[in-house]
Amino acid sequence: ENIRFDLREEQNDETFSKSISELGDLYVNEAFSVCHREHASIVGIPIFLDSYAGLNLEKEIENLNKVKEEPERPLVILISGVKEDKLKMVEPLSLIADKVLVGGRLPDLMGDKALESVRLAPDTQKVIVGNLIMDKEDITLNTVDRFVSEILKAKTIVLAGVLGRFEDEGHSQGTQKVFQAVASSKAFKVVGGGD
């Protein structure tokens, strides 16, 4: 079913890893989005089996390296969602991107210290921090227009996270319109989900 239903998965339990490894002859990791986790299915099983990166995992790494090393410009990175730890990426990303768009709940999570780090970014014109509607569950229409304008100029786009509580129809407009702009763009795109 789902390996995460078993507590031993997240504990990276060695006995659990060994028992799962006995079900196969080799291990192929296709799960780029969880490679950072120290779970049994990611780092435990490979101890007991010959292990390989799958073709999809290799392609995702190749695409990220392309963005990092030789992006076609302008490069626009949209960082959004609800995880505050994403904020620490704004400044480093501003060193490689032509524009960094900050959306989702992140503008609301930016305390004075986080805002100061954005202000200290090498070229603050590169960083566009979105505005939120009154209940803070979506970005404003002005922010949508500004983000879409930057996206339509881009030759490379990296998108990480949603812009509002998109599962609620009343708060899905920002995500829908910005994602439609990304989808219709002819730019090279790397899209990651999550919050």
Which residue ranges define each predicted feature?
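Active-site loop-to-helix "anion-binding N-cap" substructures in soluble metabolic enzymes
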Residues: 2-195
